[in-house]
Each structure stands twice: as structure tokens, then as C-alpha cells.
């Protein structure tokens, strides 16, 4: 099988040296992602496209899906690459490929040609279109808005029969821009802002301020791992977790009620800036939108920025909540965000929307900054690929099994789309489907006399969810890894 990767248009208008660098980086990213599906595949870069050739037909859908999620790709063409002799040969091959698809439909033919030939692209379109119209009685030519467009590409002595076109996410290849650190909370905003910077070519690391215990961190790990696995798995990234409960306690004790929100954000920026400096990261990323909450007025944002020299990027600054939720739905983080436990350790009764710098600084004079230094120093830092192993260490009390007993039921916790694409069927045991994002609200409705064996393809989500359910008091859960 063969795929032709078309570049994001902004890449094609770069200077020659920059364009070549972007294409080289994108080629490497494609190799890094696809090697998990087929180690024998070939990725070949050209000036205006990249070819992907693979042998394992069983991985066709998986490879195609992975390509649509790699930043820097505008669209993917799935093609059949065959030799040809003349225009009539092109027509005959197109007839075999498209006959069934054109029955009872309107169609047109569109040809792109590269190389030296005795015919033009328009001549091929007319010849092939006329031939198809004559040989398929129920088909009819329609040049504007046809039911089917027959796409052909002629390159030297090769004919590319385009079997399908699939849109990519666009943007720049990850690694063409410098690293950033996303302040991720697991909600709608931070997930979308992280995705937007990945799509713009940045390697996105994650920094999480834990205000609500292990359950909150588990949920945020899921979001970060999902974003990385789906859009950024070509690169290694860090997941940094900072226990911010001591900082919140100090704020509650020492800071005036109305100033708490701004002071908390300033503390987070200070801590994140220290982490960014430690790892050589150039900017912070937040999901703040202008006017969304009291701390996100222009005055307050300016005061928050003042505590650090590190650049703070806010890709959602002009977005409304509905737009953000729609984007979260498109990238697949909506369900995470809707079920994410909400923790707010600092809730002001009357938060200021126009903080005064002198007053904020006066309140911060009461704060013991050694507490902030301590939590940053003790922050955990893991390679996001090791989240499964890290979770395995955390879930020491959750048993992992490879078989099942008479009272066991396997619980498939994959998303609905994954379940539909690859239904789980195992002889000798009942299989129940319940997506991971419904476990927190629906698991209690299941038969609690049964032992539930949580299963997902890679085992990451099942371990995370097993720990979460154990913390909620459910002892009848195990992790199933055949």
C-alpha cells in the first residue's frame, strides 16, 4: 500500500532552506509514529510531498488514521501506483478502479500531471471521462458538484489511482518550533490550548498543580497521555506534577479573601517558570480566555505576567467557551473534561477583577516563599511514555490477571469509536462495554457481586481507572492483561 502525504500550505511558502528543514523533520516524525505499526515501512521525502509505503495490509486503517493526526500534514492520498503506456491504458485502469463507485452517480475526472508526456492534463481528463461515460451506462458527467470525483495523478511513466483523500490536522511539524510547558488542569481550556501549540510545531511538556489528591492527578495524567499519544507521540515529553496543597493552605491562612485568586495564579506562574528554566523550556502555555473568570481580566493577567520573565502564551485568549468546547469535542478531550473532578482550593467570596499591584505585593509579603520553593523542588517528573509503569507502581493493591474465573466479567473501557472499530470478543467470559469516561458515574450501577476485569489495548487507561475505582471504595476491580 502507498500513501502520498501533502504538506501544510504554509510550509510550501517558506524559503528553500526552511522548507527542506520542515520536510526533513516531518519525515522523521512520520517514521517515529508509524514504526509501532510496521517496522518495514518506507518513508521517502520529496520536494512537494512525502511517500509512505508499507507491506502489512492489516495495518492499513491504523496507519491512515495515525497519519491524519500528525501535525504538518494537510491531507493524505491513499493511492494505487501502477505503470501505464498511453492514455487508453490510463482509461482502462481507471475503469477497473472506479466502475462500481460510479454506478448511478454523477462524476468528473481531475488529473494532475508531472513529467514530459505527449498529452496534457485536460486531454487525459476528457479521454478518461468520455470513456467512463460510455462504458458505465448509469453514470453521468457533471463538472460542478459531482457525486464522485475521479482523481488521477500522472508522474513520468507511473499512474497514481487515488482511492481516497483524508484530511490531516495541518499546522507545522512538531520540533520545528521550540519547547513549551503547558499548565494543564484536565479541563476544556488547557487541553485545547496544549493541542493548538502542538499543531503549531511545539513539543509540549505538561505541568500539573495538584490541588485535589491522587484522583485529580490520575485524571489529568489521562488527558496529557491522550493528547501526547494522539497528536505528539513522535517526541518524548515530560509530565511534571507539583503538590500545591501546601501553597493553597498558606494562601488561605495569610492572604486577603479578595486577592486569593490572583495570588494563586502568580504562585503557579512562579513555580512553572522555575520548572521551565530547569528544563530549558522557552514559554508557558495556559488556557486562559479574556474575561472568562475574575482572574482573567486584562489588569489581572498583566499582574500575573509580571512575576516572571518567561513568555506566557494564551492561544485561547479571544475564544468563547462554546468555541473551546467544540474544539475539545473535535480533538477528543471533551469527555475527559466533562468528567474531570473539579478542585478549587481557593474560592474567594468577592474576587477582585481589577487587582492593584501594591496591594497584591503587600499580601504576598505575608507568604512564606520557602513553601513554594519546597514544592517545586519535590515535584515529580516522569517521561509521559512511562505513565503506564508509574501507574503500575501506584496501583500495587490492584491485581493484574491474564485469565478469568467463573465470577469474572471483562469490562471494555475503550471509547465508543474504538469499541465499534474493534469489538472485543473472548470465549468463555462475558464482556461488558463501559467507556472510561463513564466509570465515575456508571460503575456503581453494575452488578457488584461480580469481579470486574478492566481492559484497554495498552493497559494504561485500565490501570489508571482501576486505581481511581479503588480510591472510590470499589474492591471488586482488577486489571486484565492477556
From Swiss-Prot:
GO terms for cellular component: cytosol. Disulfide bonds join 344-456. Keywords: ATP-binding, Cytoplasm, Disulfide bond, Nucleotide-binding, Redox-active center, RNA-binding, Thiamine biosynthesis, Transferase, tRNA-binding. It is found in: Cytoplasm. Pathway: Cofactor biosynthesis; thiamine diphosphate biosynthesis. GO terms for molecular function: ATP binding; CCA tRNA nucleotidyltransferase activity; tRNA binding; tRNA-uracil-4 sulfurtransferase activity. It catalyses: [ThiI sulfur-carrier protein]-S-sulfanyl-L-cysteine + a uridine in tRNA + 2 reduced [2Fe-2S]-[ferredoxin] + ATP + H(+) = [ThiI sulfur-carrier protein]-L-cysteine + a 4-thiouridine in tRNA + 2 oxidized [2Fe-2S]-[ferredoxin] + AMP + diphosphate; [ThiS sulfur-carrier protein]-C-terminal Gly-Gly-AMP + S-sulfanyl-L-cysteinyl-[cysteine desulfurase] + AH2 = [ThiS sulfur-carrier protein]-C-terminal-Gly-aminoethanethioate + L-cysteinyl-[cysteine desulfurase] + A + AMP + 2 H(+). ATP binds at residues 183-184, 265, 287, 296. InterPro entries: Rhodanese-like_dom, Rhodanese-like_dom_sf, Rossmann-like_a/b/a_fold, ThiI_AANH, ThiI_fer, ThiI_N, THII_Thiazole_biosynth_dom, THUMP_dom. The active site is at 456 (cysteine persulfide intermediate). Residues 404-482 form the Rhodanese domain. Residues 61-165 form the THUMP domain. Its EC number is 2.8.1.4. GO terms for biological process: thiamine biosynthetic process; thiamine diphosphate biosynthetic process; thiazole biosynthetic process; tRNA 4-thiouridine biosynthesis. Its main location: cytoplasm. Pfam families: ThiI (PF02568), ThiI_fer (PF22025), THUMP (PF02926). Catalyzes the ATP-dependent transfer of a sulfur to tRNA to produce 4-thiouridine in position 8 of tRNAs, which functions as a near-UV photosensor. Also catalyzes the transfer of sulfur to the sulfur carrier protein ThiS, forming ThiS-thiocarboxylate. This is a step in the synthesis of thiazole, in the thiamine biosynthesis pathway. The sulfur is donated as persulfide by IscS. HAMAP family: ThiI (MF_00021). Belongs to the ThiI family. NCBIfam families: ThiI_C_thiazole (TIGR04271), tRNA uracil 4-sulfurtransferase ThiI (TIGR00342). This is tRNA sulfurtransferase. It comes from Citrobacter koseri (strain ATCC BAA-895 / CDC 4225-83 / SGSC4696).
